Amino acid sequence: MIYNFDFWLTTYCQAKCRSCARTNENTGDQQEWLNTSHMKLDTFKNRLDPFPHEIGYIQFCGEMGDPCMHPKINEFVETSFNYTNDVHVLTNGGLRNPDWYTRLAKTYTNFRGKRTGVYFKFGVDGTDHDTNWLYREGVNFDKAHENMHAWFTNGGRGAWHFLLFDWNWHQIPEACRMAKDMGAYINFKFNNRSHGLISNEDKQAAVELLKEFDV
């Protein structure tokens, strides 16, 4: 049997996503109960070293913080390849810079054969700053777009994950065009939480757009 691992590397994040567990939905502030900290590299290695089974992929998720906030994210990525050939990173895209993404893409894309290396999942929910900010408050859209562009145009594996809200579903055509321009696969998913929940009527219109653009 093959096992996958999901690690929360950090509880730090610059975003104030209102449906995120780390964020107070009413104020946008960090939850009072949340202790901000970064995982130690030794903790990561100590969890994996004794594991006796084959590992499919290691994922650094953004459940309580963005992994790119971790000051040693590079070391975690590099160390992961002692245990697997496939590393996934989830991010809002607004951290680091295009040079960082370019170097990572050129170093870790298909570096041990086809479909191995680093796979980025970018959570960006709009085609402009104001729209993305409605959920991803605190994220610089222009920076996120530049980072996505650097990753995908340099051969990086991954996907653009676009949550559909009542305020952004009409941007499906533009998002598809932008994804195509940078060679990115785009994945749309309907938000099912109360903040920004799309109406049934608009959801049906969005479904028709998704069919039209075959996504």
List the model feature ranges, each with a label.
Residues F120-D125:
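Conserved phosphate-donor/acceptor-positioning beta-strand/loop module used by diverse small-molecule
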Residues D166-K180:
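Catalytic cores of alpha/beta
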